[in-house]
């Protein structure tokens, strides 16, 4: 859904204003035009009460949010923004497939190289009262087909971990039967895999943009022209504008050192490049899914900060490159705004014209992104 002009102006005012009191005034006056408007602003100064919500990395294992949650302020058009109110805030950690694999191996009493550090990580999550989620692993599981019996072991390992009060190696590998409600929950998780099929369009879109950027990076033209070609492909071939991904690819095409580690998998030509492009697309989708969960929670009247649990350094780097500044919704319009966008770094009339033309499009038809990815994959294969 393209953001409407009035919505865009409202969000831009919030984005560019630096005075917290003026931000409150802007929200209170402009949000009256909506039936329901909730936004979280992540740049209004550190709140000492939100110290427990800070990002952490423990011996390489992360609890990373998509912004600095300790600097957040929750806006709701049903309340005066300057008045004190009590808010219940939850925190959920989304464990990636690698972390779940380590957990499954410990439960199955298999050797784990970094065993004690990992158990300490699991203990910290439990003691700090994070809710557990494996949505991003469900997503990964679809991309890397796993036998149903093996996948059931993953799910039961997570459910067992959630059930335990005391986390030790012995308690994790103990064969104790779980309470019946926990088995019901495990079945619900297994059944929810079907919902994740809907996310495949998002995967193919991101994979297409990464593939096109990789192709352009191998060509002899200046970085600005490469980015213009990528933007044109995104807007006119894929019929979509993804600011986060385009910002990342702008850095990638300009050989920016800040993204070198994050995109190490797609920095050079290799026989594994298509697989590496897919893996990087999944990394980016982890972030997208976490953001979507936060918005869905807000729509239900809940404020829940979501984190990614991973040991993947590339994913950790991507999460930190361009954190959220504002997230939420204005009626049915989702709002996701980050600290930076590529328009701050590359001023060009051609870009402005391309974006304006895209915004004013009326006849946006359906695009088969799977076919688009298959097509561009053949172009990537020719380079190898």
List the predicted regions and their residue ranges.
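Active-site-proximal, substrate-binding regions of enzyme catalytic domains
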Residues: 2-306, 319-326, 330, 334-384
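Acidic beta-strand-to-loop metal/phosphate-binding motif
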Residues: 308-310
């Amino acid at each position: 859904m393209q953001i409407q002009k009035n919505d865009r102006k409202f969000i831009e005012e919030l984005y560019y204003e630096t005075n917290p009191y003026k931000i409150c005034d802007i929200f209170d006056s402009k949000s009256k035009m909506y039936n329901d408007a909730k936004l979280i602003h992540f740049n209004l100064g550190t709140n000492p009460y939100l110290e427990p919500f800070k990002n952490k990395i423990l011996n390489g294992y992360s609890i990373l949010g998509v912004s600095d949650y300790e600097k957040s302020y929750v806006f709701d058009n049903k309340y005066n923004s300057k008045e004190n109110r009590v808010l219940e805030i939850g925190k959920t950690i989304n464990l990636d497939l690698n972390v779940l694999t380590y957990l499954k191996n410990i439960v199955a009493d298999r050797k784990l190289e970094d065993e004690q550090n990992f158990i300490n990580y699991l203990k910290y999550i439990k003691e700090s009262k994070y809710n557990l989620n494996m949505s991003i692993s469900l997503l990964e599981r679809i991309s890397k087909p796993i036998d149903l019996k093996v996948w059931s072991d993953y799910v039961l390992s997570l459910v067992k971990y959630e059930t335990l009060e005391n986390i030790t190696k012995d308690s994790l590998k103990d064969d104790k039967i779980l309470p019946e409600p926990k088995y019901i929950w495990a079945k619900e998780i297994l059944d929810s895999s079907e919902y994740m099929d809907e996310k495949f369009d998002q995967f193919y879109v991101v994979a297409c943009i990464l593939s096109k950027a990789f192709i352009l990076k191998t060509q002899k033209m200046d970085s600005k022209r490469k980015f213009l070609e990528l933007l044109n492909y995104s807007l006119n071939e894929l019929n979509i504008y993804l600011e986060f991904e385009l910002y990342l690819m702008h850095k990638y095409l300009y050989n920016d050192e800040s993204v070198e580690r994050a995109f190490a998998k797609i920095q050079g030509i290799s026989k594994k490049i298509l697989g590496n492009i897919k893996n990087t697309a999944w990394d980016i989708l982890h972030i997208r899914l976490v953001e979507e969960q936060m918005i869905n929670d807000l729509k239900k009247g809940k404020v829940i900060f979501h984190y990614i649990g991973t040991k993947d350094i590339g994913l950790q780097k991507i999460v930190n490159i361009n954190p959220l500044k504002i997230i939420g919704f204005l009626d049915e319009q989702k709002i996701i705004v980050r600290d930076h966008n590529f328009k701050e770094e590359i001023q060009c009339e051609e870009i402005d014209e391309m974006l304006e033309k895209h915004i004013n499009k009326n006849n946006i038809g359906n695009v088969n992104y799977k076919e688009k990815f298959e097509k561009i994959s053949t172009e990537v294969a020719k380079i190898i």
